[in-house]
Regions:
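Short glycine/serine/threonine-rich phosphate/pyrophosphate-binding segments
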Residues: 13-23, 46-47, 91-92, 103-119, ...
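C-terminal non-catalytic interaction/assembly regions of soluble proteins
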Residues: 256-359
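N-terminal phosphate-binding or glycine-rich loops at protein starts, especially the Walker A/P-loop
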Residues: 1-50
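Glycine-rich oxoanion-binding loops at beta->alpha junctions
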Residues: 48-106, 146-153, 157, 359
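Accessory alpha-helical/coil subdomains and C-terminal extensions
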Residues: 97, 108-110, 116-120, 148-167, ...
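Short, acidic/small-residue loops that bind anionic groups at enzyme active sites
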Residues: 30-31, 37, 121-145, 199-206
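Short glycine-rich or small-residue beta-strand-to-loop segments that form or flank ligand, phosphate
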Residues: 3-11, 69-71, 104-108, 173-176
Length: 359
């Protein structure tokens, strides 16, 4: 007999349903007596006791369905120890609801903030398994997160579509890709779509170098240029500012520009006189069905999580390392970001074929 809880937290993405399906199938095909409880809308459901028992029917036909059948919400880790508006101790409430159902394990699907809370619950004595979800691919301890390649596909398609109109009108186009702190999504979508300039948070850009790349293409007979810009891209000047000054600068910029891409566009226009167009795919990058790669990855991660549960092994994240599913102790990975390093192989390969990173 196993009694488990499932919870999806943070921003939604593709393959959340597919991953939960992998967990449940991995258990139901190996034990006869299984109870599964789904906590609704992320940690809110665990805090306030909003849950329901799930059956095999709930997991039928969801391999290809985007979003999450459980709903999700954001519960910042830094506020987890702070009582709610009614004075409720959220951590104690989560523990009580876990024990109320007499769970053997709680399987938590989410990104970095979700993972930190998962580790907190582990420290509080609960049996926890975390599965790494994010389109940013920025979770330390795994080569790949589910949702990433689906988002790469969507962002790449968006840039591909811009290519045709950019070439027809001989214009400079900026496509803004999701990623506030890390640039994996922009990097991969930029390379996959043949972007000429890629700007990511980890490599502060020099706008003059960006303009130089555009002018070089014009001299070589290319009348259009495509820039893939992460929403967290930052200039070299801004990157050197102290945190408080940078925050003020960003607040001031936000009153002038809808996002960083519009700022980059204005800076290019001021230096070249060119007309720049900006396209923002936005939340479409998180939506839709998971791509085949993510369906396979999520099934493998879910199956590996089921194996840990069957063996009564808890306190781990299940990651993918060198093509193999691995268990990673939560205390080793919680709170760590996997950043793009300036000397990453992907960066070196991209530069070798002429892609500019504005540095």
């Amino acid at each position: 007999m196993k009694r488990i809880g499932l919870l999806t937290s943070g921003g939604d993405c593709q393959a959340l349903n597919a991953t939960m399906r992998g967990v449940v199938k991995g258990l139901s095909h190996n034990i006869d007596d299984l109870e599964v409880y789904g906590f609704m809308n992320g940690y809110k459901g665990l805090i306030y006791g909003d849950y329901r028992m799930l059956t095999a029917k709930d997991f039928s036909g969801i391999l290809t369905r985007g979003g999450t059948i459980l709903g999700t919400s954001r519960q910042p880790f830094k506020l987890m120890r702070t009582p709610d508006a009614n004075g409720l101790d959220k951590v104690e409430a989560m523990k009580q609801n876990y024990h109320k159902l007499n769970l053997d394990c709680l399987v938590i699907l989410g990104g970095n903030g979700t993972q930190k809370t998962a580790n907190l619950l582990r420290e509080e004595g609960l049996n926890i398994i975390h599965l790494p979800k994010t389109i940013d691919n920025d979770i330390w301890g795994t080569d790949m997160t589910f949702g990433f390649y689906s988002a790469v596909n969507i962002a790449t398609d968006a840039i591909d579509c811009i290519h045709t109109t950019a070439s027809s009108h001989n214009r400079v186009f900026i496509v803004e890709v999701m990623g506030h702190k890390v640039g994996w999504l922009t990097l991969y979508a930029g390379i996959a779509s043949g972007a000429d300039v890629i700007l990511i948070p980890e490599i502060p850009y020099d706008i003059d170098k960006v303009v130089e790349a555009i002018e070089r293409r014009k001299r070589n007979g290319s009348g259009f240029t495509i820039l893939a810009v992460a929403e967290g891209a930052i200039s070299k000047e801004d990157a050197q500012l102290p945190k408080k000054e940078l925050k003020k600068k960003m607040e001031a910029d936000s009153k002038i520009y809808p996002s960083v891409s519009y700022k980059v566009a204005k800076e290019i226009e001021d230096r070249t006189g060119m007309e720049i167009r900006v396209t923002v795919p936005g939340h479409t990058q998180r939506g839709g069905s998971p791509c085949p790669y993510d369906r396979v990855l999520s099934t493998r991660l879910g199956s590996a999580a089921a194996k840990l549960i069957l063996n009564d092994e808890y306190g781990y994240m299940v990651g993918l390392i060198n093509g193999k599913t691995k268990k990673v102790p939560l205390e080793e990975c919680a709170g760590k970001l996997k950043m793009v390093t300036p000397d990453a192989q992907e960066i070196r390969d991209a530069k070798r074929i002429g892609i500019s990173f504005g540095d």
